[in-house]
């Protein structure tokens, strides 16, 4: 029975989320806090599954990891979300109206089609942003996320604030979409991302693993060597990796970077400044040597 439950719990959870947003009262849909609460409850539910069917003892959630990860979850859903809205979504929406851009075809599409379109739109953009972060100076913003030394349902929110802002950007505001469909898509993506980071032993149907990112695929992305991380970039929709040739089968048990050094919150925040700080320190050393 337990094996059956953990085989189907991922697709069933996604189905329940979609059903919730289909029947949710208009007053709930109009309140942006509904998606925050729904996503938080989804992550909490998935996190609780670790106590029933743990995947790796070495990834077991302890008090320090819990409070650290909770801090990032709150940061991402409040401060970062607000910044994305004010600095990206609202200006993009204003530009859309100023240019007279309309997409009636999306607005009049069936609810589930709007959800699927929004999921793909967000994930495809995140895929390329994530991939760029592994191939350019942007690695300094993303590397802190790879310094995590264990995985759990909340780990998807852990990272440098600049990275969290960048990966939250999308062009959804350019399209006319039902608000409930957008919130549903965000809730679905949170669920899949939480499943993909969870320390839970799942055995999903093959069709689920074909479309959605699993803990196996994502743990491989968190391998300890930099070159090993350059695959399976999709946070939730692994189909993007399959389409773009970056998918790789496998699983990792040992995760982390730089000899698995765990970063504190302060170290996560200042990590992108390391090259600048190193340069300043080197110049200070040169000046001191010259003064002698």
Where on the chain are the PLM-derived regions?
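Structural signature of hydrophobic alpha-helical transmembrane segments
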Residues: 34-44
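Membrane-embedded catalytic scaffold of the fatty acid hydroxylase/desaturase
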Residues: 71-258
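Cytosolic-side membrane-entry/anchor segment at the start of a transmembrane helix
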Residues: 1, 63-78
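N-terminal membrane topogenic signal
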Residues: 1-12
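A membrane-cytosol interface segment of integral membrane proteins
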Residues: 255-292
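Short, hydrophobic transmembrane alpha-helix segments
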Residues: 20-33
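Membrane-helix interface linkers and caps
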Residues: 42-69, 90-103, 252-253
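Interhelical loop and helix-boundary elements at the membrane-water interface
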Residues: 3-4, 58-64, 153-157
